[in-house]
Amino acid sequence: MKKLFSKYTFPILAACSMSLFTACDKDFAEINTNPNAVSVPTTAYIFSKALYDGAANSGNKGSLLFGLMQYTTSYNDVEGFGSKYTASQVNATGGVFTNSYPTQINEIGEVIKAVKDDPTKVNQYAMARIWRVYCFSRLTDLYGDIPYSEAGQGYNLSIFQPKYDAQSAIYADMLKELEASATALTTSNTSTFGNSDLIYQGNVTKWKKFAYSLMLRLGMRLTKVDAASAQSWVTKAIAGGVIRDYADIAKMSYTSGGQNINKNPIAWQLLNDNYLRADGINNTEGGKYQDVFINSLKANNDPRLGVLSVVYVNGTASSDESIQKGMPATINGTKPADFVTFSEPKQTTVLKVDAPLLLFTVAESNFLLAEAALRGWYSAETASSLYETGIRAAMQQWDLISGTTGTIAQARIDSYVAAHALKTSSSVAVQTEQIYNQVWVGLFPDAQEVYNNYRRTGYPALTPNVYPGNATGGKIFRRFLYPVLEQTLNRASYNEAVQRQGTDDLLTKVWWDK
């Protein structure tokens, strides 16, 4: 597949080559033309690649967010874990930005350019626009102001130093794009990406639900800065129809063989970078589950503990819940003598490289709807029933991810739900905290979406790790840093963004977090 995308990887070289050889002999050109080569990649192939690359960014620096949200830690100071807020972890935050623009942002832009003016491809155009919103939303939520309106225009319009759009403008446009795309999708048009659509295999109805679910997510993101707009978009999303059935979950499927792009990006990165290994003791970077996460699961008698976690006993993985133990993030540089006794992600669930990656779930829809109900924006169901449905869905989805290895007994689910009912007689703040404590566990391992909701709501109420020499004064990051290279290659646009948004600092809040 690499050859198919060479034109888009080296556009300037290709353009220069065309001008150099215009005077060449026709026969020479014919001799040097490979009749079996693909001169222009098919739109379907580019769409598949954009899906793969966009989903892969869930793994890119995902382990850093694991540490930041206190799921995991390491006794070493390594950039793979964000649990200590150290210089090496700070310097790693530009990676998502650097990796996104040459891949999924450029790729989905090429798809849109190819189909937007063809009235027979209205569904392809809508699907591509929805995926573009997904990719950009993940990017802007980490950095704030980013290149958006001029992004990916180097080959087409020779814009090599794109401006940074304000996050407020990006959000306004993304929400409008979702509305327009969802409206445009139609079952009367059969032109889709078919099996090249690795999420829904061309199912128009499911793409529509995905669009409205993203609208629900992004609309709720506005609650701190513009509650009126948040309510308006959330109401539209609910009316349009969001993901409520397991068959509609947005997910990418993977395999255990083939190239790395075919493997679950979260599991693959954790294993490939040696941050977490399934052998208990020979762990190069010293990663384990953090005590905050394991202690919470144990204290709440959460049946997911045995699904997510193992301790290696004499070289054999044990899911015995009584022996699970998290490692403190305060351990400094020296491998603890009892390292092997700390819990780590289970190989057959969390570290399963052929497990699907869930992009939007039934659990997330229900938790967001529960908050909407608390705010008085949705009255068809109670916050309590939506909250409970969210918990059940979050537990049952491990069966979808891992098969029978992830199955949780119905009796244990029922018992947990009964013990953690929403405190409807308490304040809205107390109930909101309950909802987002469940999001912390229920959306795992999507650490970025948990991080987004943590910044917006303040829940779960995590206690920062005041590690010696940390770079944030013992505070949890509020955003990622732009790549240092942007200060050289795109200085004017970078400076404008910093002046508007605030210092390029880990503690500067993005627009919707202010």
Locations of the language-model features?
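Beta-strand acidic-aromatic groove motif in beta-rich domains, primarily in extracellular
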Residues: 59-68, 144-146, 230, 449-452
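Amphipathic alpha-helical surface "interface" segments used
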Residues: 72, 194-206, 316-317, 323-330, ...
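C-terminal functional modules
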Residues: 395-514
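Membrane-proximal, proline-rich intrinsically disordered regions
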Residues: 24-73, 99-102, 106, 110, ...
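Structured, solvent-exposed acidic/aromatic patches
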Residues: 40-42, 75-131, 135-402, 425-432, ...
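Bacterial Sec-dependent N-terminal signal peptides
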Residues: 2-3, 8, 17-46, 53, ...
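Short acidic (Asp/Glu) and glycine-rich catalytic loops that position anionic groups and cofactors
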Residues: 26-29, 346-347, 410-416
